[in-house]
C-alpha cells in the first residue's frame, strides 16, 4: 500500500465534467493498493496520514496535522502507484491489487477515514478522473 500525499491550498476531482470531490486547504491523498494489502494495514496508514504533521504551526514549522490546520482530505484511488518501475521502459502493474478486490478495500478505507475525520471527499474508483490542485509548498510525501 502506498499513499502519495500533497499539501494543497485547494483540490478537486472531476468525472465526466462533474465534480465528485472538492476541498480547500488540506491533503490530496493518492492511494495505491497492492495484492497483499489488508484493511488493518490500510487503517494504520490512514491514521498516520491524518496525524502526519506537514502544516505550518504558529511558529511557521511543520507542527500541525490536517485536523489542527482545519483542512480537508481528498482521497483518490490510484493503482499506478503500485507499479514496478525498476526494469525496462514500461511500468509493471502486477503488484497492484485486482480491481474487484481493490474497490472493496478502497471503499472500506473511505468509510474508515470518514469515521476518523469529518471533512473527507473522494474521487470515483477506477473512473477516468481529472484532478485539479494547487500545491502548497510544494509539500509532497510518499508514505507506506
UniProtKB/Swiss-Prot annotation:
One of its GO terms (molecular function) is Gly-tRNA(Ala) deacylase activity. It comes from the Bacteria. GO terms for cellular component: cytoplasm. InterPro entries: Daa-tRNA_deacyls_DTD (IPR003732), DTD-like_sf (IPR023509). It catalyses: glycyl-tRNA(Ala) + H2O = tRNA(Ala) + glycine + H(+); a D-aminoacyl-tRNA + H2O = a tRNA + a D-alpha-amino acid + H(+). It is an enzyme of class 3 (hydrolase). Disulfide bonds: none annotated. The keyword Cytoplasm applies. One of its GO terms (biological process) is D-amino acid catabolic process. Its EC number is 3.1.1.96. Keywords: Cytoplasm, Hydrolase, RNA-binding, tRNA-binding. It is found in: Cytoplasm. Transmembrane segments: none annotated. An aminoacyl-tRNA editing enzyme that deacylates mischarged D-aminoacyl-tRNAs. Also deacylates mischarged glycyl-tRNA(Ala), protecting cells against glycine mischarging by AlaRS. Acts via tRNA-based rather than protein-based catalysis; rejects L-amino acids rather than detecting D-amino acids in the active site. By recycling D-aminoacyl-tRNA to D-amino acids and free tRNA molecules, this enzyme counteracts the toxicity associated with the formation of D-aminoacyl-tRNA entities in vivo and helps enforce protein L-homochirality. A Gly-cisPro motif from one monomer fits into the active site of the other monomer to allow specific chiral rejection of L-amino acids. Homodimer. This is D-aminoacyl-tRNA deacylase. It comes from Acinetobacter baumannii (strain SDF). The gene is dtd.
